[in-house]
Amino acid sequence: MSLTALVRPFFYRRQKQLDLYSTQARQLQMHVLKRLLSKASDTEWGHLHGYSSRMSYDEFAAHTPVSSYEELKGYIDRMRHGQKDILWPGRVKFYAKSSGTTSDKSKFIPVSTDGLHDTHYAGGRDAVVWYLSRHPESRLFDGKALILGGSHAPNYNLPHSLVGDLSAILIENINPLVNLVRTPCKQTALLADFEEKRKRIAQEALHANVTNLSGVPSWMLSVLLQVLEEAGVDRLEQVWPNLEVFFHGGVAFTPYREQYRKLIAKPGMNYMETYNASEGFFGLQDDPSDESMSLMLDYGVFYEFIPMDQLDSPHPEVLPIWDVETGRNYAMVITTSSGLWRYLIGDTVRFTSLHPYKFVITGRTKFFINAFGEELIVDNAEKGLAEACAATGAQVLEYTAAPVFMDEQGKCRHQWLVEFSKEPADLDAFARLLDEALQRINSDYEAKRYKDITLQPLQMLKARPGVFHDWLKSKGKLGGQHKVPRLSNKRDTIEEILTMNKD
């Protein structure tokens, strides 16, 4: 009997629990909230806000402010220095380092032992549960998982306390049994130098029976190209004939889809999106025919949502899951078993279904262009690029865009810098197709483009190969969960990359 067939029954019971998402969402979420309030009742934060398991949702919302990282930073800094019972009971030993705020280079997100197990590892387990339920023929565990991670370092030299990429913290604490079905070895997986790591992974994984991949599409693509180079072949199934699925997350997969289809041309290759972040594991694509993800309702995360049109108001409406609507953009607010309380994570989502709750990620609260009232979000950009690529046969590797407030003629427009893995025959035609697609997708953009009165046609600039890689390297952000900002209301990022583009 294959190992996959042997372990499959252990996942069956969990599948029955996941089926409750359609009918018991409110009950599941209230159970999570009660558990979080009970555990935090004897913490400093819990005492400050009067937490207990008897608290109702309305009381919790009335007593607890919506918080940004800056507002929790003082508490987190004390936790990082070893103080206990601050935002979560006991000492929190792990901190996931992610991109910073306007005042700090990096954020340090607490990851408690509870959070590791009831959220992050639970997400990995449930990805397998749903995958096996959809693919009874799978032989997932008969080979190895190539899991791409970042690196970590000691946290203020406190014993057994680490700070670094979430993926590295997960690898460091993973059940030893998982190492039997994982590659590369831990030493290689946790290397800090991504370029050395990529070569070592390729060499180690080359002769393994890899059946599945897990990681960020952009960084995984770099590793897979190295594998092909080491093997001297041009398609991945020539190296790993039993490869069957890529569990991906961290960035939108749309810009990379065609490149993966060319690298892995075998029929039946599967792709499953996951919504895992430093702050928690929130969603899984349970149906390959539906791009939306199911919201994970029984982890250590309680969800709330702020309508995007109210985000900047002094007293925005904050909605629990049972009050959201489909088709509306929301900023996500989370309360977690790692001590984040009504934390504005910075991601925006739109629900596509309420039974069960399914959603798509539409962007970031800070990654958008709204310099002229056009309200362009990352979801619009991804869809527009996909349409332009489909029409021209081009393939986009990386991109960023920002407003030009006034050019030499006093005109305003959007400026796009795009690195292609396959260039369009006519860059101007590609730009026109993108501009037209954005107008179809976004009525506010269309209104501002009307007769070129407010916005001129977008400007498309071609990036030299590797310039985005070089920019990330200059920031010390190769590998892990680092990514290029797609859209910005400011020109800082695009100006830095444009300067490097001239080199």
Mark where each language-model region is.
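Active-site diphosphate/adenylate-binding microenvironment
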Residues: Q27, H31-Y95, S106-V111, D118, ...
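Conserved helicase ATPase motor motifs in RecA-like P-loop NTPase domains
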Residues: A96-T102
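Short strand->helix junction
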Residues: D114-H117, E423-P424
